[in-house]
């Protein structure tokens, strides 16, 4: 069964929705773990920058690869995926839950 990437929101689209509705919000990312082969990011999303607790969180794990975006940018890709997951875990999923970037990885396997 195939899938249509156009039915998934990009992280950029989710961010635009978030900032449009929460101009005083805050997004915080943390590199939780990194070694020579992989990294793990956590993102926290806050409705207001002064909120003591996040409204939603998201995690992402990426491995460095020999081809594709993760050959040169697995850390950046991981942070972006983590942010997209945190936004989707709240209300910014725009239909299907995974981001377009995450679903694009399916073709790699």
Where do the PLM segments sit?
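Basic/polar, acidic-poor N-terminal "presequence/leader" segments
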Residues: 1-23
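Positively charged, aromatic-enriched nucleic acid-contacting surfaces
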Residues: 22-109
């Amino acid at each position: 069964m195939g899938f249509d990437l156009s039915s998934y929101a990009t992280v950029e689209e989710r961010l635009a929705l978030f900032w449009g509705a929460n101009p005083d919000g805050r997004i915080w990312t943390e590199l939780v773990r990194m070694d020579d082969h992989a990294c793990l990011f956590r993102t926290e999303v806050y409705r207001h920058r002064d909120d003591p607790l996040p409204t939603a969180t998201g995690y992402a794990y990426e491995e460095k690869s020999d081809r594709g975006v993760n050959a040169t940018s697995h850390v950046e890709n991981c942070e972006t995926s983590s942010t997209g997951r945190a936004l989707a875990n709240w209300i910014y999923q725009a239909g299907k839950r995974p981001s377009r970037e995450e679903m694009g990885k399916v073709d790699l396997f």
